[in-house]
Amino acid sequence: MIAVDVPSKSLLLQHTDPLTLRSLLKHSKVLDHEQYNLAVRHSLEATKVLRNLGVAAPAPIKYHYRWPGKFKPGAHQIVMAEFLTLHRRGFNLSEMGTEKTAAALWAADWLMENKHIRKVLIVAPLSTLERVWLSEIFAVLMHRRAGIVHGSREYRLDMLRMDMDFYIINPTGLAIDSVRKAITARGDIDLVIVDEASTYCNASTRQYSALAKLLQPQQ
């Protein structure tokens, strides 16, 4: 049995071996309660540990996030955001029109809000940089700063020197060596969102090589 206590941001559990769980989980304590025998801080780390142990702990974002923006998230978007916050890498293969963009931005915002990441790079088709991504950031994350890294080489490098929360670039721009190196040199971009994964289905392209070098700098 598991429940969420929202005011205290805690998970309440009834488990057969609460002492062992307590030894594995930081910020937890055994309870003398008729329904629950363990309280755990509802953090991302605790949720992952519990899930690895077979306990169906919900993602913290579902209960401890204000979901900012002009509209409320749909149930499917909450599921998307939960998945994205719980996994270091993943694909969202939902159909068109399911508002994947907003779900990804909410997930990124929650991760920033809770100090799991610092800044985000969005790699997306040129036609979507402003019309889709920048527009959606303004719609759902009005408190965040975002900039489009497009134009001359010098302009791109200047944009990357600016203090933004989201840097939005197209695959061709990422393939410019000096631009990619400037992104890596920042040292504070901890999350990369890649739009249109089909762009990278051919490993022999410059776009694929550039993204691989960014995600695996040792190559």
Describe the predicted segments one by one.
Residues 1-57:
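Charged, low-complexity intrinsically disordered regions
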Residues 94:
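The Walker A (P-loop) glycine that initiates the GxxxxGKT/S ATP-binding motif of P-loop NTPases
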Residues 16-23, 31, 55-82, 86-89, ...:
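SF2 helicase/translocase NTPase motor core
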